[in-house]
Amino acid sequence: DTPLAVISERPQILFNYFRQQFAQVTNPAIDPIREELVMSLTEYIGRVGSGILTPDESNCKMVRLPQPVLTNTQLDILCNIRYKGFNTTKLPILFDIEKGESGLSSALDELCKQAENSVDEGVNYIILSDRDIDSQHAAIPSLLAVSAVHHYLISVGKRVQTALIVESGEIREVMHAALLLGYGASAINPYMTFAVINDLVAKHKIQEEYATAEKNYIKAVDKGLKKIMSKMGISTIRSYRGAKIFESIGLSEGLLKKYFGTETSTIGGIGLRDIAREYTSLNKDAFSEAHSEGELLPNNGLFSYRKDGIDHAWNPEAIANLQIATRLGSYKKYKEWAEIVDKKEKPIFLRDFMSFKKAAVPTPLDEVEPVESIVKHFVTGAMSFGALSIEAHEALALAMNKLGTRSNTGEGGEDNKRYHTSVDGVSLS
């Protein structure tokens, strides 16, 4: 219920401009809990080989990963691997903040060229890293960097000859990991997250050893990735990598075509200029002298409402009016709630930019379909009986029967007695 990234007044990371796509069915394509047996996050990364039809030893220069999240130790081992045929290089994903859009554009072009040259030199593990940021050099969005390199190497026919590993402080949430993998990353290293976990353990804010806390974080990300993959019926991470099963909201067609391998832009939006400006703003804030050592980061109210934080559609005023309206059956309070929802002070959703265009001359009511007939076209959303609970299921059935329309919920499980039960003459079945 927070503003879309493209209309937010605050600087946004690039991850926030994407939404997951999913199979729109009443039952999950795969149940990631009960059907976990058919799912796998095991990945083999490295050089596939130049000719898969004539296999040779070059096809075997790969590393098996049980999951795509690498710890700092695992990444260090990969960086210093000394076996014949295993070569690693680290490419910085930074741009000069003084140059703005041109600096970001040239940095991306140079990054792609460096990646191609590395492949030509026999490097089969390319690590894209933003560890070296400073007050003059901001991080290129990790998603933009990996997608740009991924699609560039595809265009020159060299993508399968190397693995792309992202070492970034941006990665925190499961969605971030899913996006990076979905746009071509072979593995990821969220070093900043591990640093935060280490700090929490050192300050005894987490009552467990660092190794256990680190393992728990990786386990949480793994379960989250399986849940995201299951929404599209994908059972292995190897099928998910590079699949780009996301929708961008607020990015321009030019940006998507050049760096993300698609021209589909629902509403258009920002390009490199705005991305450079937002990441420059975030970088300057990070290196601002106004911050003292040990100062807590501000809570901007992303996940829960805060007075001076990010705007929320479901703010305390809206929730209070809705609760009062339902508890008291007050139509006045309902109208107040509807006013808050329909006429926000600042836009949050795309629909907030739209309004009804009133006709110059009202159409007589006797020339249009009556209200009683219109409501019969409505149906409820499809949810299972178990997900709704008996109380909600009966309330929906009663309401739909009163209106003369249809309830699309149930999926079995109703008590047979309901077929013979009614409330005020209205059936509960």
Can you describe what each PLM-predicted range is?
Residues D1-S105, Q114-S118, G122-Y125, H176-A177, ...:
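Flexible, glycine-rich loop/tail regions that form catalytic "lids" or insertion modules at the edges
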Residues A138-V166, N216-K223, K227:
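Alpha-helix-loop-beta-strand connector modules within alpha/beta enzyme cores
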Residues L128-L144, N416:
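Glycine-rich, proline-tolerant flexible connector loops at the mouths of alpha/beta enzymes
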Residues D130, V149, L180, T236, ...:
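Conserved, mostly hydrophobic/aromatic
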Residues I7, R131, A138, V166-G169, ...:
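Glycine- and other small-residue-rich loops at beta-strand/loop junctions that grip anionic moieties
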Residues T162-V174, E411:
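Glycine-rich beta-to-alpha transition loops that act as phosphate-gripper elements at the mouths
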Residues R131-I133, G169, A185, M192-I197, ...:
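Short, ordered loop/turn segments at secondary-structure junctions
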Residues E170-G184:
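Catalytic cores of alpha/beta
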